[in-house]
Every structure is written in structure tokens, then in C-alpha cells.
Amino acid sequence: MSEKLQAIELEKSYNPKEFEERIYSFWEANKCFSPIKKKNTKNTFTVVIPPPNVTGVLHVGHALDETLQDVIVRYHRMKGDETLWIPGTDHAGIATQSVVEKKLKAEGKNRRDLGREAFIEKVWEVKNEHHSIITKQLRKMGVSVDWDRERFTLDEGLSQAVREVFVSLYEQGLIYQGNYLVNWCPSCGTAISDDEVEHEDRKGGMYHIYYKLADGAVLQNEAGEKIQEIEIATTRPETLLGDTAIAVHPEDPRYASIIGKEVILPLANRKIPVIADSYVDKEFGTGVVKITPAHDPNDWEVGKRHNLPVLNILNPDGTLNDAVPEKYRGLSTEKARKAVIEDLEELGLFKNEEKIKHAVGCCYRCHTSIEPYVSKQWFVKMQPLAQKALDAWKKGDVVFYPQKWENTYAHWMNNIRDWCISRQLWWGHRIPVWYCADCGKTIVSRTDITECPHCKSKNIKQDEDVLDTWFSSWLWPFSTLGWPEKTEDLARFFPTSALVTGHDIIFFWVARMIMASLQFTGKAPFKDIFIHGLVRDKQGRKMSKSLGNGIDPLVAIEEFGADAMKFTLTFMCGSQSQDFLIDMESFKLGSKFANKVWNASRYILGNLAGRTIVPVGRDGSLNSLKELDRWIYHELNEAAQTVRSSLDSYRYNEAAQKVYEFFWNNFCDWYVEGTKLSFKYGDEKEKDRAASVLLAVLEESLRLLHPFLAFVTEEIYSKLPGNCAEGALPRAKILMTSDYPEEKKERIDEAASIRFRTLQEIVRNIRALRAECGIDPQLKLKVSLYIEKNSPAEAARENSEIIEMLSGLSGLDFIDSLKEKPASSIGVVGAGFEAFLITGDSIDIDQLKKRFEKELEKNEQNASKIDSKLKNENFVKNAPPEVIEGEKEKHAEFLRRIEKLKGYLEGMR
């Protein structure tokens, strides 16, 4: 049944603040975020959100993560897949505990003043307070997560999963405890894993020190002189107090005579052996190194090979302990370094210091220098788990987008080290291990115990440490769905479908999730892994608090709206994990596009009064439509196919660029403008037909755009007439849960596409020619058009009014021969046509011709110079690749300009 339309008013200006919050509440109220099982739905699509730290504040990197997930989730939901996106937060052991400890410090207290139980209560208070901040931020971003399934890594169910995994790995012999060298953060007071150590370039010194040979031993130097000391270079002179040997290469003839002898350790005055080990580089420095097994990972390995004593000289807070001479006890490593150098200098045992810049291992949380430190910790044997993860990748069970990350993944898996999982914190999953003081047994249990199962003693104590935060995060894809219980959600939605994350946590999190999932479910946790680049500032720097160059997503949303921010991030996110540069100005791209969608929709809806929707194309046939209509349906069809293909392979930027190009360039600039002729000159039937097609294409365009501009498209969609879909059929009630556009073969019309592309070329050429000639845009001139027979440009004869209107002309006529070229005109040549702009007295054609000739000569000279440069073997051999590429681009641009100028001059002949 036909529907008489009323004018539909949208607000004059696009104002996202007016509707974004309201639209989000509307989606929540209508349960749009829950999995929807449509008819004939067989596929599921599941994503778990990378859980942000519960006490953190979301930054633009999080915004990128959530945006890309939101786009792909909305797309699959509209495709008809039963779609679930699980939100949640991470308890973030070190980070969260640090927040609370800082607050206590400001009050002159520490956690031990409160006691464990009271301290943890405090942390829960802070967690609850910060959690609401994060969820508010996520809602502001418009993420379509299922809030009913929100998880937290310390939830009861997830805690049960952690216990199950720990005990199971222990029972399989894959978890063990021992005294090992670990990465110790003196500020956080805990061990951290290798992957949590970041390396920063810092200024330092290379200190050259003498060690005297003991018991009268001598060494002959290169000059043939007998000497009694050996020169050693080190960046950590304070650790010499923990040396238990010095080492030389076994095949170094310079030191063969002293292997097995001893030296006197400076300042400590104890004897240590000279050992031979192939770890030593004969060519580096003097070819002698100090060995401190307790404070260097390489020395630790050397020490194990030679059964050297392990002498720990540090306290947990990073100060020197009682194992060193009294004067150095209690000093920080920096103060001890200074004191040691001064004392060596006084003894004549210090040669010199070289200023250097070197990579220093730092805590990823507080950036304190990490100390290699021997302590009793819990570890996971990773190699057996890594092998399964490698095999799964080789079989294609997990696929990386882009593929280049597969090599990184394989390298890490092949070179994996055991994972230190214990942390000297109070906040987190407490290690499920108890020690019996009476019988000395260690008990590992899935449930809390109150007595020793071996001797029934009540004198038991639980391990004080908690598990590394990542120990709960690596279970995230299946623990969030109810594992180890056999839940309906686990059966329906696991394995999950895709993981979207940055390349900075491939090993921290991605690889570990694959290992855990294969070990405990027998399946890979997800099929697809999209690794995106990192967001950097316009100078290419990583965004950080210290640089003050970060972007707060909420500030961007306040200024531009969530759609604008998210569209910009999607548009700029390359498919090859390239880092990209951004600032607040960048979001204007998304803002302008959202504005364009709003204004185009406002124009269409505001000019429909009195029109009747007619069932054009209901039978699937578009033959009765005008060429302009058939062309836009062809372009819409091609856009839907391209966007689907791009999103199916995580080429986000290509998808965003395609919807931008289709809506702005094809729909707004050409189609909407072209339909104005029908409304201006057509009869009532023609106007109804034009309105019906225009509305149908707008309705489908909003569905195409929705994953990228969720709020504004939903707001506009809600205003559309009820029967505005193609064929005057009813539209969906809610855009978010409607069907995504798909390719329809009956819409393919290559002939219309080719013919209309030629019309566009004619219009663009006329516009460009006007601009080149400096003609006032308001001045309407005439054009004479010559069309080659049987060329696509013949479409111009049937669409002369469109060309005339879009080119800003006062008239358009056709000539049958180039001999009929009008006087006082300038021509421009295209594929199958030549257009002559009749300028009359508006410009001096002779002067313009001279200008073009002069510019042509200059461009030919420039092109020739670059051509010679690129043919110069020395230049190509020595110039940086980016310089060569830049020259090639300039050369191509000169050639394009030359071609255009020749065309203009040809048209002036």
C-alpha cells in the first residue's frame, strides 16, 4: 500500500550530544547487545574484550581496540550471525595495588600497618570506584558489548578456573617451585616475568677495574711484561661485591696460564677462581668478564655450569644487604656504585670510566631499573605448552592478520622460557598452596583447607604470594564463558571467533591464551587474530603521561562525538599493523563525514512532502529505472561487496574508505545532485519514482554505514518512513539489528557504470578546466561537446541536463565534428569526447596558452632532471630508499601534470 509522505525534520545541525546517550539507552533497553538468534542462523560470532586494568583510565589506544571490535561485532550481528561480545576488566595486580599503596603512603601508612585482610578490602573499594569510570567510558564510546555477561578476573567463577588450572598443571608436573634468578622490581617489591621487562635507552658508564692475581701468580701482557692484575670492564661495579669468579675463553692463549688460579676480589678481599667458559667473547674488551651469578642472567647460567656459589648482595628494596662489607650495607645501588668507584680509585684499582648509552631493563609498570635477583618463586614449564600452540598454528587453527606476525609468534614459541608466575603482592589470586609446619608437607588444593591432609595438623599456612595477573588473563576466552563448568554459553560460543589487539601484547597475552586453551579445552581459543598498529602522536612518539601527548577519548567524544572519533580511528588503521600518527585535529575527518551523512539525510527527508512511495524494483527488476538510478544501485552493490570482503579479512581502513567514497562521492555529490532534476522538472509520477529510489538507497546506505557510524545512522534511521526499503517494503524497526547489505546480482550493470563514469569524467574535466582558467565559479558558461561514435561518452546525449547542472553551465550543445569547434573556446580531451568551454571575453586565451606552454616547459625540465637522477647508478646505490621513492613520486606527478597541460594545449589548437 502506497504511503503519502510528510516532510521529516532533522535538527539543522549535527549535534551528537543530543542523541548519543539516548540511542545507547535505547539499544540497552531493547536488549540489542545480547546474542540474537535469527531465522536460519547457524553461525556464531564471539569476541572477548581485551580486559582493561580496572583502576586504569581508557586512553586512545583502548579506544582503537574497542572501536575495531565494535565495527566487526556490529557487522557480524547485522550479517545474521548469533553475536556475542563479552566485556570485562582485569584486576591488574601490581597496578591496582600500587594505586592503593600510594594513597596509604600519603596518609603515612603502608599495607602492613593495615594487615592483609583490611588492605584487600581497601583495594576492593578502589576497584568498585574505578570500575564504574571504565564502564561509563565504554558506554560513551558506544561499544555494543553484552553487559549482562560482564566479567572481572577476580570473579568467583574465574577464580575457580584459575585454581583448576594451577592444580592441574601442578599435578602434570608443569608447575614447580625453586630458587632461581628472576626479574625483581625493587619499587613494586615483586618478581615480574621476562615479558614484563621493558628496555629503555639510558646514559651510563663502562667502568674499567683491576683484579689482582692471588698467591703471587703473574700474567704476561702483550708487551712481554709480567703483570699481577687483570683488567675487567663492567657497567655495574657495585655488583663486584657479589662476584664468585672471573671468566676467560678456554681458547684464549692470553689467559691460558691463569685458568684455575685465583684473583683477590677488590674491596671484599676474598679469593675467587679464574674459570674458562665459551660464553666469554675473546674479541670484546679485554676478553675477561666478572661472574656474579646472583645478579646477572648470563652469569647465572655460567655459575650453574661451574657449580659456583650464588651470593645475593641485595635486599628486596634494592639496597645492599649484610653479605657485603659493612660500609656499603643499606646503600642504594646508585650510591653503592659511587662509593665502590671512589674506594677502588683510592686503592689504585680503578682505571677509567667510558660514558655510554645502553639498554636498561625496567619494570613495565613503574619504570624502575630491574634487578636480577635470586628468590624462591613458582614457575610454569612452558615448552610443552608452546609446542601445542606451534602445532595449532601450523595446522591453520589460528590465523594471523596480517601474516607477518606469524614469524614473530613462531620465534617466541621456539625460544620460550619458563614463566615466573608468583608475585610478592596481596591483591590477586592467592597461590593455592599450603605448608604444614608439623610434617613439612606442601599441599596444593582446589579448595581452601584448614588442616593438613597428611598429618591432620591445624598448623598450616597458605603461601603468601599471589599469581601473576596474566595467569587469569590467559584463561579469559573460556573462563568468561563458564569453564571449568560445562555451561550452555561455553558449548555455544566457544571457541571464540576473533581477537583484535595491539602488537605489544602478542606474547604477554595472545600466545599464552592459545597455549592455555589448547591445554585445557583441546581447542584454539579463537580462529582469527587481527594485530593492529599503535597510535602515536604527530611526531611519531608513543603516547605517554610523561610526554603529556596522550589523547583522552572522552575529550575527543565531547568535542566531536563518538562516531567521529571511531570513524577516524577505523579509517586510519592500516591492515599491515602500521603504527599511525594522530592528534585531536585528526578527528575532524570523522566529524565532517558524520556531518555529511546528517546533512544529506536532512535534505532528503526535508524535501519529501506530498510524495508517494511506489514499489520500484519490488520484482527484483531495475530495467524500468533511469540510468542514474541503475548506476547508483550498481555502485551500492559494489560498495556492499567490497566492504564485506574487507571486513571479512580485517582490512578495516579499506572498508571505511569504501563507505566514505560511496556515500560522499557517489551518493551525495552525484546521485542526490542528479535527482534534483527529477524533482525540478519531472511530472508527479517521475517525482514519486525519484523519491522512492532515493529513500531506498538512503535506507540501505545507512545499513551499510552503521558499523562505522553507529549513533548517527541509528538516529537518522529512526526518522525514516515505515515503507522506505527497496520495493516500498517495511524497513527494520532497529537499525542495529537489521540486515547488512549484500551483493545482489540483478543490480550489476557494468554498462551503466561505464557510461556514468564517463559522465563523471566529462564533468570533472569541465570543472578542472574552469579552475585552471581561473573562471569565477558563479559565472555560468556554455560548453560544446564532441562525442566519438560508439563510445561510452554517448551517454552524455541522454544526460545533458545532469552534465549542465553539475558543471555549473548555462548551456550544453553537441557538435558532430571537431571542425565545428566554437570560437573563443578552450578544449579538454577525455576518453571518447572533447569538451569546449566557450569563454568569450571572460579570459585572454592567448595569455592562457602562453602560461600553459611556460608551465609545460618547466615541468618537462623538472621531469628530465629527476629521470637523469634515477638513471644515475651512484644515486640509486647510495640514496636511502625513502629518498628514491620520493623522487619517483615527484617524477610521476610531473608526468601527470605534463599530460594534463598537453591536453589543454591540444584543446586550444
From Swiss-Prot:
One of its GO terms (biological process) is valyl-tRNA aminoacylation. Pfam families: Anticodon_1, tRNA-synt_1, Val_tRNA-synt_C. A motif ('HIGH' region) lies at residues 52-62. The keyword Lipid metabolism does not apply. Residues 843-902 form a coiled coil. It is found in: Cytoplasm. Catalyzes the attachment of valine to tRNA(Val). As ValRS can inadvertently accommodate and process structurally similar amino acids such as threonine, to avoid such errors, it has a 'posttransfer' editing activity that hydrolyzes mischarged Thr-tRNA(Val) in a tRNA-dependent manner. This is Valine--tRNA ligase. It comes from Treponema denticola (strain ATCC 35405 / DSM 14222 / CIP 103919 / JCM 8153 / KCTC 15104).
